[in-house]
Amino acid sequence: GFTLESWNKKQVFVDKAGYFSICVDNPAAEFEIEIVKDGKKAAEKTAEKADYVVAVIGCDPVINSKEEVDRTTLGLPPEQEELVKEVAAANHNTIVVLISNYPYAIGELQKQVPAILLSASGSQELGHGIADVMTGKASAAGRVNMTWYHSDEDLPDMNDYDIIQGKRTYQYFDREVLYPFGYGMSYTTFSYEKMQIKKERGCIKVSCFIRNTGEKTGDEVVQLYVHKKDSRVKRPIKQLAGFERVHNIKPKEVRKVNFTVQLWELEYYDVISERMILEDGNYQFMVGASSQDIRLEQSIMIDGLHAGKRNPFQTTAADCYDAYDHMFLHRGINGSSCVIPGSAGDDPDMIGECLVEGTLIYHDFVFYKKPRKLNITLKVLETAHITVTGENGVQITAEP
């Protein structure tokens, strides 16, 4: 048997009226499962007799995919995986309709069925829309707006919110994925041709042509990405700079697609000057059908600012670091920020229990002549053991 818990972790019992109640003094009720009808077996028998099977699985936006519910795994519910496995074994013409508002790790599911159709939840026309796409009445042209990973091992600790250091999202993840950001299939194919790029006042203009090389009319979602080469800081591998869904392109038809990228959209926050800057240098623009299906690319030089250099004779705020390891940003005094050592999942308010050593790195301190004596002033809130290390063997240890 098994017991039940309420949402606030209290045991459940059955009262005299036969209703579920929360335990106060009563012992928790013990329940047993009695199988009246095996739904999976019934689905399997039905699948054996059918020409095609449509298996609808996924999540519910008011139960397990609502706000405040954190998943502990990317996997599908085991019962759903087992259902598809048994139905697909009974009928190889099984199409899975996955209703989901977030990514799943469905690599094994992908091997079991010939087609998977993804749709977000909601909408009273959901059924009609799915039917139109499955029958070819409407062109399939949806694109995933998140990266779909192979497994939980591809992600860092769920308490680690740093997408750069944790290498999350299409911008920083550098390994193979199940479905890349922007991915989606169509009933036809497209070629990309004649990319052009030019600078205008305050913006970059990018254009290309797409050609329907298939036999059916369809839509294509053309995506523009950008990457800053040789940046002082770690910039995204690719960053979406624009996209356009081009509707109803007939076979052999050619359409022109135009993008305008404002220069301020290429800025990043510079921790040295503590403001947004447009870094000068070489920018790579890429056009494609997804973040990993790049068809055309060109580079262009953009005039901007040189990345800053740190002045050793001015105060550098502790939270204006270039890199870190095992550190938290936290509340300081008088509304300021501070940095404290800790690991993902630690409570930064319990600094005495954060026992790991942390590292902060500040690049590009420039001395215009070699100093004979170096004085470093550090401001700390609590007793700490601090070691300052430079590139040329400079090491200072202080215990405030």
Model regions and ranges:
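Hydrophobic helix-and-loop "lid/oligomerization" segment in the mid-to-C-terminal part
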Residues: 38-111
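Intrinsically disordered, low-complexity Pro/Gly/Ser/Thr-rich segments with frequent PxxP/GP/PP motifs
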Residues: 232-271
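Secreted, periplasmic, or luminal enzymes acting at the cell surface/secretory milieu
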Residues: 99-219, 225-227, 251-253, 280-294, ...
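Short, surface-exposed ligand- or partner-binding patches at beta-edge/loop junctions that are enriched
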Residues: 260-291
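Acidic/polar, compositionally biased interaction segments
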Residues: 1-45, 78, 235-239, 247, ...
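Extracytoplasmic
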Residues: 9-25, 30-35, 282-284, 301-400
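Solvent-exposed serine/threonine-rich low-complexity stretches and specific carbohydrate-binding patches
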Residues: 2, 237-248, 391-400
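Hydrophobic beta-strand positions in extracellular immunoglobulin-like domains
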Residues: 210-212, 261, 378
